[in-house]
Design a protein with these regions (language model features):
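Outer-membrane beta-barrel translocator/receptor signature
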Residues: 117-122, 131-135, 140, 144-225, ...
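Acidic, small-polar-rich N-terminal luminal/periplasmic segments of exported/outer-membrane proteins
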Residues: 30-167, 579
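Gram-negative outer-membrane beta-barrel transporters
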Residues: 473-475, 589, 593-603, 616-711, ...
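Acidic/polar loop-and-plug regions of large Gram-negative outer-membrane beta-barrel proteins
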Residues: 229, 237-333, 362-388, 437-449
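C-terminal beta-signal and adjacent terminal beta-strands/loops
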Residues: 543, 600, 645, 702-709, ...
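Structural signature of Gram-negative outer-membrane beta-barrels, strongest in the C-terminal barrel
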Residues: 394, 406-421, 452-598, 638, ...
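Membrane-embedded beta-barrel scaffold of Gram-negative outer-membrane proteins
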Residues: 186, 337, 341, 345-353, ...
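Face-selective signature of the C-terminal outer-membrane beta-barrel domain
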Residues: 311, 315-318, 328-362, 379-496, ...
Length: 788
């Protein structure tokens, strides 16, 4: 733990669980809202829980929809900000599987693996305004066959949006809080209009907050959601939704352990002290203990010898503090859907979608000089550092559909998914002036002076599934099915070291890689022993597609390295087995489950350079397997008409089964028998909630056990306990009827702790790997909400 000097206001975001209920039958994807949180998924042949969108309203204003899933067993979600919406430092782990090994959808539309520099989707925080989430469904382990994902090795999260209301209405919410946080949310529902019963909704959200570490960084988000529903008779309807997002975020700075101790818990970027950033870059370029005329830090020649070679205290390297970094994202995603019944025995669903994204990751880098840095007469583009923007854009479109046959005891479902994705990625460098910062990290930059390794990608995804849900008698449900998928990705280098290249040119590379398996089976059952007890079990297999992005398998280094990787590696694969018990009493619900997972063909990259900043080409290899064993238990108690309690406990033992070896047999990483990095073994969640219709509130406790950010487990991160609080009041009479005031406080006890990581590393015996984010301090927010 760390000692910090700030004392903030007191009040936090937590999930109020009043009104929690448990499903009596398999949860169906209806459009009707629910005011309950479904924990146990009664009747399902696998672990499935559904959380209502109302739960998000008790979280901090604008919190990520994933925040409402934190209380579920096996879920480890953490980040550097109190909202969980800052993507670079938000971390989701489910039963030992990382976020990029899970699947995510919104109204069935794929969101990709939700990685930060996403190549095939976007984060749910940008895909929809959090207040517009109707519900979120979590399927652990074998996941769902119908999930439109090719990364769901460890489970899937399906989000569903609120439909427009049948009557006219409006919602307005205003929020304010620590770090100058302010947020507006507004939504208008037209109600049914016209002779066809059309209904629509329009929503807008505008958020601003300062970065809590130094209050100089700024984070803004603007989102627009439009949805239209058109009934077609009594048993069919069409829907159209379009969601736009503009996000401008200054970064939180990751640190090493020794940097946190030396620089302090609140250490961050240098902005607005640009001259200090220039000085640190000059000094870094002057350090030359090797005596070869080039910097030991940057590899550059000296840019200002008069600056000397001694860093001013407390700084000891150019990596201790950069001037600024940011993430810029513009997204537009939309879908047209048609669902309904063709007859009493035949249901169908069809969806067409598209998504465009433009992104840039600005960073004031001291490792590259501006083009005129060595010209003493220059007054522009003459700084000893440069503005680097990792830039990318993509356009993807696709369609998915399913058809359900009700054949009495058998429910047959057949579905498919197709997607085409065209993208472009590259590192682009822009000049900076020595006298002042002439570029804004929160604005897209154009006309670079240098472009390094720009790639064009083309990816095609095809997937289908078929399943039979058989109920031979009322107490027994059996599920049989399988899915098949093929993902083919081409990557062609367009620019090599600032030179446009084409086939036949030196430096040009091309790689096509496929992941394909047309039989990935899944089995499951649920058996109701009596009115109170039920057992369930499942087994399933999943395959992950290769990520198609810069530095990936087919877009990395030389043609020889790409050809070697394509010929050598296999896609990652998981096999999950699960057995559980559900119990339902008068005022109690309970769940116990055990699972076992075989995760094979784990993929890793070896780098010839040890520099975390300037990376040479990678060598990709499958490096062995992971075996996971775990148990989960959940208890819900309805203590009175107004008071409820929830406790969940998870134990997950995920271990590497092999050491990582290089091609010549030498040891690279000693991982055999080590715990999987980034996954705590113990998780404990507890919540107590009160709601009498007017006064409401909740106190939430979470314990995350020790975890590792190194593969060799040589530097553990301490366990942490956190408390969150929410309290509010609904007005039900007079002019204030329909109004609500609430207060949220995150990290109530103001704990200092390491929360997340930007990357996992081989080992860190000296604590100098700069990959850790500290957690946000106590933060308080007040929200006024009015419904009309």
């Amino acid at each position: 733990m760390f000692v910090r000097a700030r004392c903030s206001a007191t009040l936090i975001a937590s999930l109020s669980i009043s009104g929690i209920a448990f499903a009596q039958a398999p949860v169906a994807p209806t459009a009707e809202p629910t005011d309950t949180v479904v924990i146990l998924g009664r009747g399902e042949p696998r672990q499935t829980q559904t959380v209502s969108g109302d739960a998000l309203l008790t979280e901090a204003p604008g919190a990520s929809p994933i925040k409402a899933l934190e209380q579920l067993p096996g879920v480890f979600f953490t980040g550097a900000d109190p909202f969980g919406s800052y993507e670079y430092a938000s971390t989701l782990n489910l039963r030992g599987f990382a976020q990029t090994q899970l699947g995510f959808t919104l109204d069935g539309v794929p969101l990709g693996d939700m990685s930060y520099s996403n190549h095939n989707g976007l984060h749910i925080s940008r895909a929809i305004i959090s207040e517009n989430v109707d519900r979120a469904q979590l399927a652990q382990g074998a996941s769902d066959l119908d999930a439109a994902s090719t990364s769901n090795l460890g489970g899937s999260l399906k989000f569903y949006s609120r439909d427009p209301g049948a009557v006219f209405g409006a919602d307005i919410a205003l929020s304010a809080g620590d770090d100058q946080h302010r947020r507006f949310f507004g939504r208008v529902d037209t109600g049914e209009f016209g002779v066809w019963g059309t209904r629509a909704s329009l929503s807008y959200a505008d958020s601003f907050t300062n970065v809590w570490t130094n209050n100089e960084g700024k984070q803004t988000s603007r989102q627009l959601n439009v949805k239209l529903v058109q009934p077609l008779g009594s048993d069919q309807e069409m829907s159209l939704w379009i969601n736009a997002s503009q996000r401008r975020e200054n970064d939180y700075l990751e640190h090493s352990r020794q940097q946190i101790d030396r620089l302090g818990y609140f250490a961050s970027y240098l902005q607005p002290d640009y001259q200090l950033a220039v000085l640190l870059a000059d000094i870094a370029n002057n350090v030359d203990e090797d005596g070869d005329g080039l910097s030991d830090w940057t590899g550059n020649a000296p840019t200002n010898p008069a600056a000397g070679a001694i860093f001013p205290s407390p700084y000891q390297s150019p990596d201790d503090a950069y001037y600024q970094g940011a993430g810029l994202r513009d997204d537009v995603i939309g879908a047209l859907g048609w669902t309904g019944q063709l007859n009493d025995q035949l249901d169908f669903s069809l969806t067409a979608y598209s998504h465009t994204d433009k992104g840039q990751g600005p960073w004031f880098t001291p490792y590259v000089t501006s083009p005129n840095a060595y010209d003493p007469a220059a007054t522009t583009d003459n700084a000893p550092l440069a503005f680097r923007g990792f830039s990318y854009d993509f356009t993807r479109w696709g369609g998915l559909g399913d058809i359900d046959f009700d054949l009495g005891q058998h429910q047959i479902e057949v579905g498919g998914w197709y997607e085409s994705n065209k993208s472009d990625e590259g590192f682009r460098y822009f000049g900076l002036d020595r006298a002042q910062a002439n570029r804004d990290s929160l604005e897209f930059q154009e006309n670079p002076f240098y472009v390094d390794d720009q790639f064009a990608f083309s990816t095609e995804t095809v997937k289908f599934y078929i399943q039979d849900t058989w109920r031979p008698f009322d107490a027994l449900t059996l599920l049989f099915g399988f899915k098949g998928q093929r993902v083919s990705s081409e990557a062609a280098k367009r620019i090599e070291d600032n030179v446009i290249v084409a086939p036949g040119d030196e430096g040009y590379t091309f790689g096509e890689i496929k992941s394909e398996d047309w039989f990935l089976p899944q089995l499951g059952f649920s058996y109701r022993i009596d009115s109170d007890n039920e057992i369930f079990g499942s087994a399933g297999e999943s395959l992950a597609a290769f990520a198609s992005q810069s530095g990936g398998v087919n877009a990395n280094g030389s043609q020889a390295a790409i050809d070697d990787a394509i010929a050598t590696i296999e896609p990652e694969r998981s096999r999950t087995f699960e057995l559980g018990w559900r119990w339902q009493g008068m005022n109690l619900e309970a769940l116990a489950a055990a699972y076992y997972v075989e995760f094979d063909n784990r993929l890793a990259a070896f780098f010839a350079s040890d520099s975390p900043i300037l990376v040479s080409e990678a060598i990709y290899r499958n490096v062995g397997s992971v075996r996971t064993r775990g148990v989960e238990a959940t208890l819900y108690a309805d203590l009175s008409d107004t008071l409820t309690a929830l406790v969940s406990l998870s134990y997950n033992q995920s271990e590497y089964q092999d050491d990582v070896l290089r091609d010549d047999g030498t040891l690279e990483i000693a991982t055999n028998g080590k715990t999987v990095a980034g996954a705590p073994e113990q998780l404990l969640k507890a919540e107590l909630a009160y709601d009498d219709g007017n006064l409401f509130g909740g106190l939430s406790y979470s314990y995350s056990g020790e975890w590792f950010y190194t593969y060799e487990n040589d530097n553990p991160v301490d366990a942490v306990s956190l408390l969150d609080l929410n309290i509010g009041y609904r007005f039900s009479e007079g002019l204030a009827e329909g109004a609500e005031i609430s207060v949220n406080v995150s990290n109530l006890l103001d704990e200092s702790y390491i929360a997340a990581w930007s990357g996992l590393v081989e080992r860190d015996p000296d604590g100098d790997q700069q990959v850790l984010f500290v957690g946000s301090p106590r933060s308080a927010f007040v929200t006024l909400r009015k419904s009309f």
